[in-house]
Design a protein with these regions (language model features):
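Metal-dependent catalytic neighborhoods of phosphoester/phosphodiester hydrolases
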Residues: 65-74, 89-91, 224-231
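Cap/insert and terminal regions of metallo-dependent hydrolase folds
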Residues: 151-252
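Conserved beta-strand hairpin/beta-sheet module of binuclear metal-dependent hydrolase folds
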Residues: 1-44, 127-145, 162
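Active-site neighborhood of phospho(di)ester-bond hydrolases with catalytic His/Asp-centered motifs
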Residues: 28-31, 51-59, 79-82, 141-144, ...
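Active-site environment of divalent metal-dependent phosphoester hydrolases
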Residues: 60-64, 85-87, 126, 148-151, ...
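Metallo-beta-lactamase
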Residues: 82-130, 134-137
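Active-site metal-binding motif and surrounding structural segment of the metallo-beta-lactamase
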Residues: 35-81
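Structured catalytic core of nucleotide-sugar glycosyltransferases
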Residues: 6-16, 58-63, 89, 116-118
Length: 268
């Protein structure tokens, strides 16, 4: 059947993505209330009972707000590295011991024919990760909350059929915005979030003929807009000599208030 996915919600207020392959259905993060996650799942004809587990990227509230409630309600295993478990355990409430699963950074785990592999990213959290999903020859990468894209991250995200990649802010909108300077400095720093320009620069370096789509994710509601993000990302790519036709590669939207359509990774 191959990999398909939907980004249920993406942004500074909450992040939830679902990846499935016919045998297994996994959720990445649970950054909204359990009630809201259930509503978004229903929009894609799913319920919590369809889920086989939750993969955690890091401990910030916009990624774990509903984590404990979802795990308890549906008896779901939670997969996270040891340091992330240490950062989330007190805040998410009681979790059954059999649902506390350690997946260390760089390790992989097979769920039937789908392999999940985590890799380290740069963010101001205990031990943040992003995830690659493999099934046969298919590869999906989900990577947000990056201060910058290191050479190791470029290697990890390259050659994906589809990417979900952070494009958090427009630098000038952030600089002129209402946040205090220490918050702006954190967002702009190497442990912060990826700007539109940085996302475009990264794509220009890793894009191959195999990669058909990139979903721009984790957009700031205060310091970005989807049309601006797509224009800036494409401009940054073209500035670096990376030109493409829409028939070859597309930049796709994500939303904070509704899910993206199901997307089959293998579609042309």
């Amino acid at each position: 059947m191959g990999i398909s996915f939907t980004v249920l919600s993406s942004g500074s207020t909450g992040n939830v993505t679902v990846v499935r392959n016919g045998e297994t259905t996994l959720m990445i993060d649970a950054g909204l209330s359990a009630k809201r996650i259930d509503e978004l799942l229903a929009m894609r004809e799913l319920t919590g009972t369809d889920l086989d587990g939750i993969l955690v990227t890091h401990e910030h509230s916009d990624h774990i707000k509903g984590l404990g409630a979802m795990a308890r309600k549906y008896d779901l295993p939670i997969y996270a590295n040891q340091n992330t478990w240490g950062a989330i355990e007190k805040g998410i409430g009681k979790i059954a011991e059999h649902n506390k699963i350690i997946l260390e950074t760089g390790q992989h785990r097979d769920f039937g024919s789908m392999r999940v592999e985590s890799f380290a990213i740069s963010h101001d959290a205990a031990e943040p990760v992003a995830y690659n999903f493999y099934d046969g020859k298919e590869k999906l990468c989900v990577a947000t909350d990056l201060g910058y894209v290191s050479d190791k991250v470029k290697a990890a995200i390259s050659d994906a059929d589809v990417l979900v990649l952070e494009s958090n802010h427009d630098i000038e909108m952030l600089r002129m915005g209402r946040y205090p300077w220490n918050t702006k400095r954190r967002i702009l720093g190497d442990l912060g979030h990826l700007s539109n320009e940085a996302a475009g620069a990264a794509l220009s370096e890793i894009l191959t003929g195999r990669t058909k789509r990139a979903y721009l994710a984790h957009l700031s509601r205060d310091h970005n807009m989807m049309d601006l993000a797509k224009m800036s990302v494409r401009g940054a790519m073209e500035d670096r000599g990376c030109f493409y036709k829409d028939s070859e590669f597309r930049l796709c939207d994500t939303y904070y208030d509704r899910p993206t359509p199901w997307d089959k990774v293998s579609q042309s």
